[in-house]
């Protein structure tokens, strides 16, 4: 029987060849991927809702605080509030991915799931922790979700700054 060049190289180095484990049937894989896509959709929708709510809160605060604090301190606090709200939102989103990776059995602990989710969600991609072979595509799903939410956050923060610059108190 002919061996592939990759198999020969793996045996020569003494590495184990990673293959899909038999207990991960196609139906199980499809369910996990469907759950990941649902989670990505949920996180994106939640993110949009939080942005709308945060915008309302920040503009109400701006209108309320302008008389008490003055224009410049109020605007600085609005920007700080926007950045803080976005930061907490992204932390919560990474925690949702971490819980998914941990509870679905893809990570040994929540801490490992948290680290992997943070690295994937921010598209940092160190690669020091990876998912087993049949599940590797879950990382890019998390990364795409992170790109979309971080893009929305960037646009939101720019919009807040634009409102402050174009409509001074």
Regions found by a protein language model. Give the residues of each.
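Cytoplasmic (intracellular) domains, linkers, and terminal tails of multi-pass ion channels
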Residues: 1-87, 150-169
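Generic detection of intrinsically disordered/low-complexity segments and helix-coil linkers/edges
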Residues: 27, 108-110, 120
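Pore domain of cation channels
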Residues: 39-43, 47, 112-122, 126-169
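Generic alpha-helical scaffold signal
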Residues: 48, 74, 78, 90-94, ...
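Hydrophobic positions within alpha-helical membrane elements
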Residues: 52, 95-98, 130, 151
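Single-residue recognition of alpha-helix boundary sites
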Residues: 58, 104, 136-139
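Outer-pore turret/helix-boundary of cation channels
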Residues: 89-116
